[in-house]
Amino acid sequence: VIFVRHDQRQSDELRAIRVQRHFTGAAPGSVLIQAGRTTVLCTASIDTTLPPWKAAANPAEAVGWLTAEYSMLPGSTSPRKKREREKMDGRSTEIQRLIGRSLRSTVDFKALGPRTITIDCDVLQADGGTRTLSITGGFIALCDAIASIRGDLSPERPVITRSIAAVSVGVVDGVPVLDLDYVEDSQAEVDLNVVMSGEGEFIEVQGTAEGKPFSREFLNQQLDLATKGIAQLARFQREALGPEWPFK
């Protein structure tokens, strides 16, 4: 029996992905990325200074850094989400740390030199998978930002060492499914977020049983789905970047 989801996708089918690069003019990397109804603006900015703790830790080495910030705009969800001003909620803090950790795994910081890259991910519309879409879009924005300073970098030592993308997987009505939207996520018996390189290596796996525990077999099935989905996302990133794809 073929399991058909509420939006008519197959169990192993991603939502439709759309990307608009150079969406804004101020940041050297700027990407509007959509997966179904979920929409995130990812920008990458480059500063020629380092955080004080980073500069103090490596006074003799010109080693760069990457950090990330994540926020959901008030109108991105219903009911309205209160705007984060002085203090971020725990969820946003956790997500931006995940985005930062993931994207740092792609960068050779010695090749970058004494620069700080900031990835800003602002959710314009939330329908599930905002953190994973932020990573996938954030990588595209990162590539465009690095391309903007190519003339200041050594051609012998690439700054970006691997591609990464991320996707959610879960179990809905007893069936492992790929790329959950909000309806599915709210009903999921198991919820995983998987970050992988374009070569198929795992960078981070976050998983939770929402009710009863799940078996190793179900875990393997979900990781297989994630591997398939991320391979598709990596191809999409390559097509979106075109000549700016950092790997020849």
Name these PLM-found stretches:
Residues 111-114, 129-133, 143-147, 153-248:
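A structural signal for small-residue-enriched, beta-sheet-centric alpha/beta enzyme cores
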Residues 23, 28-112, 200-202, 206-219, ...:
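Glycine-rich, flexible beta-strand/loop modules in the N-terminal catalytic cores of phosphate-handling
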Residues 17-20, 26-29, 48-52, 104-106, ...:
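Glycine-rich, charged/polar anion/phosphate-binding loops
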Residues 89-94, 128-136:
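Short, conserved micro-motifs enriched in small and acidic residues
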Residues 1-27, 31-34:
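Short, Gly/Pro- and small/polar-rich lid/capping loops
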Residues 84-88, 121-130:
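A short glycine/serine-rich beta->alpha loop
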Residues 29-33, 130-137, 141:
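Conserved phosphate/anionic-ligand binding catalytic regions in large, soluble enzymes, centered on
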